[in-house]
Amino acid sequence: MTKPPVGSNRSGRKLGQKVKKGKLKASSRRWIERHINDPYVQRAQLEGYRARAAFKLLEIDEKHKILAGARRIIDLGAAPGSWSQIAAKVTNSTDTDPRVAAIDFLEMDAIPGVSFLQMDFLDPQAPEKLKEAIGGAPDIVLSDMAAPTTGHRQTDHIRTMHLCEVAAHFAVEVLAEGGHFLAKTFQGGTERDLLNMLKQNFRQVVHVKPASSRAESVEMFLLAKGFKGRHASRSDEPAEGAAEK
């Protein structure tokens, strides 16, 4: 079970450390203090994950069982790579038999078994390059993509929802039948057209906010399970609704 860490880490460093004022702005100091005292950050370091985001995926999987049996996975917005680390492990991906393809416009250090493309997913060539890198239809498409925040909540929501929509259409284009799609979104409502499209193509569509997401964060995840296949009839039963779970 993925339990929230408490107290101190196994290295003996206690939570609640302060950063000396020095020349740092108050906002920067608060961010650093929050980061170094975050139990998920400390746990990620101890368990060898590149970011605390690993526990978001593990927690979602613990409840919704999306990773077991996956043979190929595509990871969008992959840097720094914690989701790709998990994907490589569950698919038994190796450099000689890569089963994970990842993409980000940011640099990412190599991960064994992960074919990484440093490019913008919105580049017209990106989808085809990902399909070539994975060597077959993926069982899962993951997207942790988010547009750089502006501080204006509605603007940030619209920009990130655009990335979510592009990722969703890509997932429908490439997923193996029975596959799953998981994408970051922001609180503020998922676009009706996107939800309708996902419900038409997947057996179940839900919103998820894992405990490892910071309490003050507006991020949520949109999970679509059980891809019906590209030949699914429009007369199929609609998917279960996108309630928060």
Swiss-Prot record:
Keyword check for rRNA processing: yes
Stated family: Belongs to the class I-like SAM-binding methyltransferase superfamily. RNA methyltransferase RlmE family.
Location in the cell: Cytoplasm
Ranges where the record places region Disordered: 1-26
Positions of the catalytic residues: 184
Protein name: Ribosomal RNA large subunit methyltransferase E
Known catalytic reactions: uridine(2552) in 23S rRNA + S-adenosyl-L-methionine = 2'-O-methyluridine(2552) in 23S rRNA + S-adenosyl-L-homocysteine + H(+)
Methyltransferase keyword on record: yes
Job of this protein: Specifically methylates the uridine in position 2552 of 23S rRNA at the 2'-O position of the ribose in the fully assembled 50S ribosomal subunit.
A matching Pfam family: FtsJ
Gene Ontology cellular-component annotations: cytoplasm
Source organism (scientific name): Sinorhizobium medicae (strain WSM419)
